[in-house]
């Protein structure tokens, strides 16, 4: 049965008429239309159509041959668009929306702006100046470089024949695409496309000149006219071929670029559902099911249902969390955390780096840790529900995935190294929270996004007539595969860039080089980016430095605290890998250097291979805490001893285990752990809302020789917040935890839209 008929077109029109050629506005949104469902002969009768809404469908391209000569406004947001070249026929477009098309990149955006000569509004923004540069600004530069390639290495064949000319054209185009470089690497696809067009046009102009010299009277060129209905007595012809150009505009980072907010609710399935890595996100399911695995899927019918279990419709008493500041209001200063008494932080641990025998399952060499001997005491301070979709107070299904404390700058008053400000993400929102007051200082919302990861960094911002000043920025990403860059202090989302067509699973800044950002994606890759510094207008330049190939989805990234520029550890869905990330080497694409394997892998279990590393963090310069799904414990192991035992002829190296910490026996995956190196703490939440805390002191390290499993120092019970009229809430799963460096606060994120803040008791 045809989805689009003449009757439907007349019904969907805002113009009350019985003639197709009188329709000026047409709404075909949310009809589950595919490209083949658009009948070209029928739609071509809409010769006076000016505004068309095709949002919320499953279109991959605009059908070939569709001519809408009067169309000025087109909305193709929230589709499956892959081919923007199909839009070239709509030459009179002035306004176009392509948000929420997962497969489109910044290269496609540049192509669209170039192909549509009258386009002035793109995704709701005025692009007049950008479009002028894309269409005209850099044509001569590219053209001169292409001509230089021709004059240096090529000439016309003599005599000219179709076969010889085709061979020359192929060689010339390939050489030009290879040799001509312009703009950032992120625009290489667009640049190559432009260079190919310019090279072909230049060669065609040479052959035309050659023909004119040989033939006295020229043959008139046949004009190709586009058929169109007569509007006002004037036929509409296709424009002459335009000279196309590249751009040196900073890729993927327009100044003061806000997070692209869209009104249409997306319907794509999240990449963190059942199979963990979706091959093709589908839009046929109205339910947005968030992360990550079979065990966490639910049968609940609410639109954003929890992927783990059936949704328990529970609420929580909010403390000062319902009043949140609008993200577009003038920014308020991020408060500095108040001073608090703290013990002296841990010094760098000194580990033995002597080569270990492979047969030794547990390393008995003592790691010297200098941490406070007395454990801390924590009490629950706030339970916040601040990530609700559409501000729904009954939203207890949105999963919260990542949190991180704001870094303290060098001029901070707080000598303890602590911070009161934490960023949290989950669902469509990113929140910046003051742990002491429980106030949500800033809240950023991107409809249709599902944030999985975030990271803080302190970068330099240049100032006119003065020295550069440091500012804390926040990077966040998730299902859409784009990194959003935010300066919370001034309440500004200033840029974004696309990392992948698949979702972002994890991100981490290099603490030694604050502009270096690692991003892990669901297409089994880890990218290293340099976002550069910021100018006074928040312009920045993004460049890709490395591509690391993984065998499965990266879930956690950890840089060596003592040498973050040399090696990267990646906990993945199918193992723990180590990568060489030194930029002094020429190879820009790399595979893992070694795989670190654990004793749990030897356990015979047909249902689970225990290779999913869903927790990874450094406890000191050398001691690493990690765990596998279904393991029921946490390993502490030595990085230096493990690497020293590596035989370069083998990819696998057994981890040199220092201790095994008893944890919950749960089958729920992706319950990550956190560490506080300065106080020797490892913390991991479980499926009942409890927090297992391990205080790793010098005395405990002495006992590691026994090889016995060590119990938790303390297990913090779920605080059981009370919802008015409905009693206490059951404990949810704790997806993620974070502690500030001074261990003033411990924050836990749940799979039921609750942020729990614990505070250390002062003595």
Curated annotation (Swiss-Prot):
Location(s) in or outside the cell: Nucleus; Chromosome, Centromere; Chromosome, Telomere; Cytoplasm, Cytoskeleton, Microtubule organizing center, Centrosome
Stretches for region Disordered: 206-372
Record's compositionally biased regions (Polar residues): 277-288, 313-325
GO biological process: chromatin organization; DNA replication; establishment of protein localization to chromatin
UniProt WD repeat ranges: 499-539, 608-647, 653-704, 729-763
Protein name per Swiss-Prot or TrEMBL: Leucine-rich repeat and WD repeat-containing protein 1
Family: Belongs to the LRWD1 family.
PANTHER family: LEUCINE-RICH REPEAT AND WD REPEAT-CONTAINING PROTEIN 1, OPTICIN
LRR-type repeats, residues: 22-43, 48-69, 70-91, 92-113
One cellular-component annotation, GO: centrosome
Taxonomic path: Eukaryota, Metazoa, Chordata, Craniata, Vertebrata
Record flagged with keyword Translocase: no
Residue ranges crossing the lipid bilayer per the database entry: none
Organism: Danio rerio (Zebrafish)
Modification sites for Phosphothreonine: 280
Binding partners and assembly: Component of the ORC complex.
